[in-house]
Amino acid sequence: MTLTACQKDEVSPSAGATSQTITVSIPQGVQTRAAAADFGDGSQIDRCLLQIYRNGQPYGEQQTATVTGNTATFNLRLVAQQKYDFVFWADCSEAGYETDDLSAITLGSDADYTGNDDKFDAFFLCKKDYTVTESFSETFTLRRPFGQLNVKTLDLAAIPDNAADLKPAKVKVNFTSLPNTFNALTGEESGEAAVEYTADVLNATGELTVDYIWAPVEQATLADFKMTFLDAAGKEISANSDFKSIPIRRNYRTMAVSYTHLRAHETGAYL
């Protein structure tokens, strides 16, 4: 997936300063969320942030650009013959990410994470050691810092129609420990925290949940979690605690398949 961003930087002209334009773009897809395949299209991304670094320190204020028509653009004025790091973060402004420091992005204390909510999707890029020699116009592609975890059950059809009360309407998900901080400057996740939420199941075909989880590029975050199946009133039907060491890798979709007492998984690229 790609991203583009835009904002004017009111810097007084100075000797050696040249003008630059950086664009980031996100393809927009369908707005419905009827199936797991509909998640991750980037359609809820509405802002892009840019922090410029020089010699490892922030250079000027963080800038914000509105994503409109899949694109946003930053108009800059930087001193030539210098190297800069460009750090981008693009998200849905309603998600509640704490982004004052792009080297320590977390979900804010007032934000409650839940699965099956695409507003928690996000993109980033760190373009390091970019030497500004003259005016330029660049387009950069952003990537997700997450792996996407999908959970599906395959035994709903085994429940007879006259036992509809045994078909889950909601699920409670308990992750034992997940990364909770992301450094967009280094591209590394860190920290750990238990995560719990309750959400309506995605649909009646057995697709249950979709989660965005901080994950590394090469090796995988190993997720342990329990899923409790609930009826519409929140009463427990059954539970599955057998989700152990599920590998979550950045920019990949992992499908965890649940039966009454079993689970399996498969992983495949989704970007």
Describe these PLM feature segments.
Residues 133-176, 180:
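A surface/extracellular/periplasmic glyco- and lipid-processing/surface-interacting theme
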Residues 11-20:
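Short, low-complexity, disordered segments immediately C-terminal to signal peptides
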